[in-house]
Amino acid sequence: MFYRIIFFSFLLINISCDIKSDELKISQNDSLANFISSFEEYTFDESHTSSYIYDQDKLHRFDIYLTDENLNRIDNDPAAEEYVEGFLVFEGKVIKNVGVRYKGSIGAWVGCLSSPDWINPNGYKICPKLSMKININWQGDKKFYGMKKLQFHSQNLDKSKMHERLGYYMYRNFGINAPRSNHALVYVNGEFTGLFANTENIDGPYTNQHFDGGGGNLYKEVWPVNSEGESRSDEYFKNGLKTNE
C-alpha cells in the first residue's frame, strides 16, 4: 500500500501539470446564479461516507465557485481567514451556500502575501494557490459525505507534495490516530488552481469517526508566545478550546 501511494502520487503530480479546465467554466454570457442552477443539488445520504472522499486510490476534483466580489475579498486579505459565500461542485452536483476562506498558520503565508512581515501575516495574495477551508454547514445544517468541513492544503513549501499524505499514512499504520489525507484537484471559477492535499478536518465528525462515542473536548494547538516573545494570556489559551460539534 505504501509503495502504491508513492507511485500513484508520482503519476498524479505529473498528470496535473497538463490539466485543462474546459468543463465547468462559466461562459461570458452566463451569470453565476444561472450557471449554478444548471447542476443538480447534492443531498446527503447515509450511504455517503467520508471513506470515499479520502480513498487512497481516488484523485477527486473539487470545483469552487465565487462571485468576483467575494473572490476579490478573500484574495485581498487571505490572513483574515474570513468566510465568504460560495458553491462547491463535486461529481456534477452542487452544494450551495458554503463558506469559503483561505487558511493557514505562519508557515502557510510565507512568500504568499504582499507584506514581507511573516511574523504578522497580512497583505494581498501573491501565490497561485493558498490552502483553503470549505464550511459545508456555513448556512443551515448540511453535511457532505458525513462531513461539515473540507480543507485543501497548498503544500507550497513541499516540492514533493507528498510529506503530508505520507506522514499521516505512516502515523495511522503505527496505530496513532491521525487524519486521512489524499490528493485532490481544485478549480476556482473553472480555472485549475492546483494539486492540493485533501486532508481530513479535525472536528466533531472527525472525533465521531475515529473515537468511540466522539464526546469530550477537542483542543486546537496555540502558539505559546506572541511576535514579541511574550507569553500569551490565559484567555488566549482558553479560546483554543474547541468543543465537539
For each of these PLM feature ranges, what is it?
Residues C17-E245:
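Phosphate/dinucleotide-binding and metal-coordinating scaffold of catalytic cores
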Residues I5-I13:
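Sec-dependent N-terminal signal peptides
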